[in-house]
């Protein structure tokens, strides 16, 4: 699971240089095909939209939980997940379906 997290500056610069952007009602995702054969991700919840650390940590926990279901799907993509302002205005199941639909769209377009 630790191998699935983007951490290096080189990985982030590669992602921002060659990104494809995908939008949904709750997320913005930057995606870039990697050569590793599995999904790697990072989560960016900023202070401007989510004021308290409790909110930001809850967002990260929920997104990590959703991504855990995707780890064994062998999707060779690096993604940066950015939640939108309305993230807390719906239940977990809607967020999960929204993110899964975005990942399917990415999988179809990235190849």
Swiss-Prot record:
Its EC number is 3.1.26.5. Pfam families: Ribonuclease_P. Keywords: Endonuclease, Hydrolase, Nuclease, RNA-binding, tRNA processing. SUPFAM superfamilies: Ribosomal protein S5 domain 2-like (SSF54211). The keyword Nuclease applies. One of its GO terms (molecular function) is 3'-tRNA processing endoribonuclease activity. One of its GO terms (biological process) is tRNA 5'-leader removal. Gene3D superfamilies: 3.30.230.10. It is an enzyme of class 3 (hydrolase). It catalyses: Endonucleolytic cleavage of RNA, removing 5'-extranucleotides from tRNA precursor. InterPro entries: Ribosomal_Su5_D2-typ_SF (IPR020568), Ribsml_uS5_D2-typ_fold_subgr (IPR014721), RNase_P (IPR000100), RNase_P_CS (IPR020539). The keyword tRNA processing applies. One of its GO terms (cellular component) is ribonuclease P complex. Consists of a catalytic RNA component (M1 or rnpB) and a protein subunit. HAMAP family: RNase_P. Belongs to the RnpA family. RNaseP catalyzes the removal of the 5'-leader sequence from pre-tRNA to produce the mature 5'-terminus. It can also cleave other RNA substrates such as 4.5S RNA. The protein component plays an auxiliary but essential role in vivo by binding to the 5'-leader sequence and broadening the substrate specificity of the ribozyme. This is Ribonuclease P protein component. It comes from Malacoplasma penetrans (strain HF-2) (Mycoplasma penetrans). The lineage of its organism: Bacteria, Bacillati, Mycoplasmatota, Mycoplasmoidales, Mycoplasmoidaceae.
